[in-house]
Amino acid sequence: MSKAATAERARNRRGGTMTRLIKMLFGFYPVLLPLVVAGVVLCAIINSIGATFLQSALQVISESWQSGDWTAAQPKILKLVTTLGCIYAVGVASSLFWNRAMAVITQGSLEKLREKMFNRMQDLPIRYFDTHQRGDIMSHYTNDIDTLRQMISQSLPNLLMTIIVIVTVFFIMLYYSVWMCLVIIAGIAFMTFMTKLLGSNSARFFIAQQTELGVVEGHIEEVMNGQKVVKAFCHESTAEADFDERNEKLFEVSQKANMYANILMPILGNLGDLLYVLVALTGGIFLALGVPNLSLSGMALSIAVVVPFLNMTKQFCGQIGQISQQINAVVMGLAGAERIFELLDEEPEADEGYVTLVNAQVNPDTWQLEEADHHTGMWAWKHPHRATGEIEYVPLRGDLVMDNVDFGYTPDHEVLHGVSVYAKPGQKVAFVGATGAGKTTITNLINRFYDIADGKIRYDGINVNKIRKSDLRRSLGVVLQDVNLFTGTVMDNVRYGNLDATDEECIKAAKLAGADDFITRLPDGYDTMLTGNGAQLSQGQRQLISIARAAVADPPAMILDEATSSIDTRTEAIVQAGMDKLMEGRTTFVIAHRLSTVRNSDAIICLDHGRIIERGNHDELIAKRGYYYQLYTGAFELE
C-alpha cells in the first residue's frame, strides 16, 4: 500500500474516532454539553467584535477632528465604552460557566470511560490477556486517559472557540474590505499548506508515541514482576539493555513528533507577521492611490477602516497559530481515544450456554427434583429442552467426560491430541507429566477458559457448550498455583470465593484449609489488611488463604492446579489433611509436582506432549513399570 493511501486511511480513522468521541460526550451529557458549546460560541463572538468598536470609536474621533466639535463625541465614546464593558462582562460570565461545566464533563466522561473499559475487560476471554502485556493494558487507564483528559478539557473547547473567532473575524473583515481580504486569503492558504505538511507528520509520530509508551510500560511491569528472577540470574545489565532499546524507540518517535510540533508555531508566527506587513502595505497603497473600496458595508477606505482591519489581521493570524497548537493535543488525544475504543471494541467472551446451575430440592409429593429459592446444599442443572420446551433438572454429580479432545492455543499448533478423560462422581483424578505435557491445559478446557478444536466435553451428561460459563465455573472450585490476593482484609480475601458467605462460614473454611491457626496469630487476625498481593505473608500462607477461598465457595467439584507445589513440607502436611476433607464427596482434578499428593487418587493420568500414555491408580501404574513408575522411582523427573 502506498504512503498516500496509508495516510488517507489514518485520516479517515482519526475522523471516525473524533465523531465517535463527540457522540459519546453528547450521550453522557445531553443537556450540559450543548450549553457549554453555546457558551464557547458566545465567548468566541464576543472576543471577535472588539475591532468593530475600535472602528466606531475611530469614526467618531475622525468626524469630531474634521468638524472641530468634541462635545458630541464624548457621549458617543462613553456609550461605546459602556456597551463594550457590558458585552465583555457577559463574556467573562460565560467563560466562567463553560470552564466549570467542562471540568464536570471531562472528569465525568473519563470516569464513565474507565468504567466501560473495566467492565469490558471483565468480559474479555483469557486469550486476550495471554496476547497483551499487562503494562500495555494499564496504559489505557493512565496515558491514554490522560491525553484524552487534556483534549476534552482544553483542546476541544479552545479549538471550537478558535474556529468561531476565525469565521467571525473573517466575515467582519469582508464587511470592511473585500480587497484586503483577498490578501488575507492568499496568506492563509499558504499557512494552511504548511500546517497540513508539518501537522500530518506530527500526528503520525504522536500516534506512534502512544503505542511505544504502552510497550515501554508493559516492559517495566514485566521486569518489576520478575525482579527476583532478574537478580537471581544476575541479568540486571541485560534488563537495562532491553529497556534502553525500547526507551530509545520511544525517544525517537517522541522527538520527531515534538520536533514537527515545535517548529510549526514559529513558522506560522513569522508567516502571520509577514501577512500583517503585507496587509498594512496594501492598505497604505490603496489609501495613497485612492483605490475605491469594495465591501459589504459600503464604507469608503479610510484610516478608520484600515487600523481595525490590521488589528483583526493580527487576531486572525494568531488564531491560525492557535489551531496548529491545539491540533497536536487533539491528535494525541485521538491516538489515546483510538486505543481506548480498540479495547472497548474487543469481542467479549462468547457464551451461548443456556443451561444454568440452581439450588434444588426433592418435591416430597412427586419425589422429583425442583428448583429452590434458597440454599439447600443440593445443586442441579436447569436444562431447558428447546425442541419440546420442557425443563429438566439434572442433579450435579461431578460426572465429567472428555471425549477425543483436540486443542491448540493457536490454530497451527495443537497441544492436546485425541485426549479422552473420564471422572466419576466423587473421584479424585490426578494429572502428571513433565512441563508442557498439557496438564494445566486440560483444566483450562474444563473451565472453558478456552474452547476445544475438536471432540466433546460432557458434564453430568450435558455438553459443556450448552452450560452457561458463569454457572459452569461456579460449580468448580479452583486453587491456582499462582496465588492472587487482593487489597483488603484476610476475611475479604477468604470471602472472595463466596461474597454471600458469613464470617462464621469463612472461618470454618479457613479451619478446613488449615489457615485459621496462622491467621489468628496475625496482628489483627481476620481483620489484618493485606496489600501488594499479600506480600507480608509467606508463600505457604498465601496458598492456604487461596485454598480457604475455594473451600468457602463449597463447590461440587474442585480443580487443584499445582496447589501445593510452592508449600514447604510441614505446611503441605497441614494443607493435605484439610484438602482431604474438602475433597470428600467431590470430583477433584489435581495437578501437582509432588507425586505424594496424588498417590491416593482414584485415577492417575500420565501425559506426554499432549497425549495420554498411561491411566490407572497408583498400584496399577507401579505394577506396569512404565512412565509413572519411572517418575516415581526417580528415573524421570516430573519437571
Region locations from a protein language model:
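Membrane-integrated ABC transporters
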Residues: 1-47, 62-83, 98-102, 106, ...
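Juxtamembrane helix-loop junctions of ABC transporter transmembrane domains
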Residues: 7-15, 46-59, 87-134, 138, ...
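An intracellular "coupling" helix at the cytosolic face of ABC transporter transmembrane type-1 domains
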Residues: 27-30, 126-127, 143-152, 156, ...
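Transmembrane helix-loop-helix hairpins at lipid-water interfaces of multipass membrane proteins
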Residues: 31-97, 174-179, 281, 290-303
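Alpha-helical transmembrane segments of multi-pass membrane proteins
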Residues: 39, 87-106, 157-164, 183-209, ...
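Helix-loop-helix
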Residues: 64-65, 172-186, 260-338, 343-347, ...
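ABC-type nucleotide-binding domain
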Residues: 70, 360-639
